[in-house]
């Protein structure tokens, strides 16, 4: 599957209304809310052979993109160290920070597949939460959802 097709299917199947994106820049932690994850923020990568070596979309930001997001209004919400103090996994730590900022209790890890809803609901809006370096979706998951919807 090509990157463009994977992005199109991801957007078509996503249960999120918007996205909360996080990244570290010069040791500060930022977040920004966006309607869509832009294609230039995504790369096609392969998971490790230990995890099956499957192709996937990965959320990746270089410094130029981080600077652009800061100019567009990304807010500083902490430091890189804050990500390490909450949990062993930076992505989980970021999600917990977003829950805490919004006065909510975190959901159990990976309790909802991306096509069924977001990671957090804020005022009736479903948001997916992604920290720089996070997996967006494996191509095989997109294929599985396609087959499920065709047979439904």
Model-based region annotation:
Residues 41-57:
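A short, surface-exposed interaction/processing loop segment used at functional sites
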Residues 13, 24-26, 30-43:
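Acidic, metal-binding active-site segment of PIN/NYN-like and related structure-specific nucleases
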Residues 1-4, 48-51, 152:
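Short intrinsically disordered terminal tails
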Residues 19, 85-88, 129-152:
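Catalytic cores of nucleic-acid endonucleases
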Residues 114-134:
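Active-site beta-strand-loop-beta-strand hairpin of nuclease catalytic cores
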Residues 19-23, 29-30, 49-53:
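Nuclease-adjacent, charged terminal/linker segments that flank catalytic cores
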Residues 2, 6-12:
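A short, charged, amphipathic alpha-helix used as a generic interaction element across diverse proteins
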Residues 15, 52-111, 150:
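Acidic-basic catalytic patches of nuclease active cores, encompassing PD-(D/E)XK
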């Amino acid at each position: 599957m090509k990157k463009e097709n994977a992005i199109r299917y991801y957007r078509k199947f996503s249960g999120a209304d918007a996205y909360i994106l996080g990244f570290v820049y010069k040791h500060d932690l930022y977040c920004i809310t966006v309607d869509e994850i832009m294609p230039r923020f995504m790369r096609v990568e392969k998971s490790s052979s230990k995890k099956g070596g499957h192709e996937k979309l990965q959320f990746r930001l270089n410094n130029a993109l981080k600077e652009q997001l800061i100019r567009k209004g990304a807010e500083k919400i902490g430091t890189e160290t804050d990500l390490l103090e909450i949990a062993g996994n930076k992505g989980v730590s970021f999600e917990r920070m977003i829950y805490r900022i919004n006065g909510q209790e975190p959901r159990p890890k990976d309790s909802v597949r991306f096509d069924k809803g977001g990671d957090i609901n804020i005022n009736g809006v479903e948001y997916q939460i992604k920290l720089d370096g996070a997996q967006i979706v494996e191509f095989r998951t997109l294929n599985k959802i396609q087959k499920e919807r065709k047979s439904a």
